[in-house]
């Protein structure tokens, strides 16, 4: 069944590749006939492709909607060509400028601090916190974007290990195809950013009590193993819980991306210079990362202050129990929206796993005949499930 997802995305990719190839070939012929500036045109085409590839479907959707709305106005002659062109040029500049905004966070020779975070959500919060503190000139940011709780990490620091991880995600996680088409390129960019950290910069690796950030922290230290910089490891979740929680107002953060940027600012300031690791500490955590990359499983949990490998089916009974406890509308004949079930599972799960893994296991339970489906399993909002009768 996994091949269904893979083939669906292969068809999509093939169409994109054909389109890019046709555009490129058209420009080559035009350039040869006219200006001879083939190299510049091709460079522009692939710059556009790179800019859009780095955005998720939800990020791209508003741009597409705006473009279609402008085309509609032009067709109906409610907008002049000059006005429409001006708006589209502004949109183009904004979209292409996103790459330049990302470059602002790369380590530079004059920076004094480099923050390393795990996950896009926490990276966004950290950027807002650093902007709020007014220290973006000297404080830079590197994000490890992987969800280390799921998918194979065997040999992740080798090309074949990364290829295996990418293949698993493309075959099992619905929205992963685009994200893993340039996995190798992104990994090499990560290594470049690590290499660019200047000797004088203090490195702060942020983590918290979940598998994703704990394994990610160990991976970060492995990548930093040859750097001579001062390295600290800090837990913003633990800090914020201790500082802000009261008996009548208590928040337990499951991952750092849940922390508001204003509270994160306080953590950055007050944890400055704390959590320093000695050489032995770093060596121990590097060894732990190497052991993790010897495991062949696809699911890990955080338990007893350790990253533990568990079976892929570990959460199946938990999902089924949640399904049994929810009451679907009478009109739906016992079928429950999968998005509601997954939302319930995430809301009560002590582990930070992510909705994509729960959705993957839900589809596996359907394929195994444990559940019945109504709809199409293209994304969780498109189908409902119930126990097979």
Q: What do these predicted ranges mean?
A:
Residues 66-69, 83-179:
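A structured, charge-rich N-terminal accessory region that forms the first stable segment of a protein
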